[in-house]
């Protein structure tokens, strides 16, 4: 079943109404300081204008007779949660762009020395993105609990559509982030392989005497420093790879949870489609029954007319016989 996402339009209309009311309040306050009598009329006109605009936005008639039973209701509590989730989604997109630029800067650096500041920034940004994903996931799962207990069917349907839309958006973002992390991990491994190919030199075979002479001399200071630097580099690379793998595993958990939510929403939509189809079938059956009842009713009218005519004929015959007998 095709659905339309009306969340953005709803938020735009709500923000416009808030800005309009604030602007009208500022105008009323500025006119109040100038003249009290004139300010009352202006305030009344501005209130009427605001009511007209709100009526145009909401589609509610301002006719007193038509407005019977219409009450002003505050927006649902889960709308604030939707705003927070959309704000976090915007932050996730911004952080993902920053992380992509840090990855490119770290991997495409022309120098051969490693920058611990860049690696630390990559680690912090990755953790922030993962935390934002977890927060959005928990917020999306908590949206149905923030709905009113006695909410209408339209509000409940709107909430289900909003939850499905947010879950799908988060799933797409998590997939993109997971692909970016996997690509970064592959590029890291390729760089390590290229560095080993260019900098690892084969050791020539030596006799036992040369071997004893070499190890008898021991390592020089430069060789010890080089070995220590290589060890630190390998440990740093292993730590980065472990962090990337951990972030990917966390994203897999989020991906599974969001997939389960989307499956649940799809099941609800399928159930709604089934109910709509069943209602259409029952409506068609009811229409057929109405046609049959109409035909039966028409036949009953014909029989009633025939009975009345027969009764009239009998009465006339009796009257005719009575008249002739005299």
Swiss-Prot record:
Specify the protein's topology with respect to the membrane: Single-pass type IV membrane protein
Q: Can you name one GO molecular function term for this protein?
A: syntaxin binding
Subcellular location, in the record's words? Golgi apparatus membrane
Instruction: Provide the alphabetized UniProt keywords.
Output: Coiled coil, Golgi apparatus, Membrane, Phosphoprotein, Protein transport, Transmembrane, Transmembrane helix, Transport
Q: Which residues lie on this side of the membrane: Cytoplasmic?
A: 1-302
Q: Where is the t-SNARE coiled-coil homology domain?
A: 231-293
| PROSITE patterns (UniProt xref) | SYNTAXIN (PS00914), T_SNARE (PS50192)
A GO CC term attached to the entry: synaptic vesicle membrane
Q: Which residues form a coiled coil?
A: none
Q: Which cysteines are joined by disulfide bonds?
A: none
Tell me the residues on which Phosphoserine occurs: 41, 74
Range of residues in the leader sequence = none
Residues in the Vesicular compartment per record: 324-326
What the record says about family reads:
Belongs to the syntaxin family.
Its function, per the record, reads: SNARE involved in vesicular transport from the late endosomes to the trans-Golgi network.
Q: What is this protein called?
A: Syntaxin-16
Q: Which organism is it from?
A: Mus musculus (Mouse)
Gene from which the chain derives: Stx16
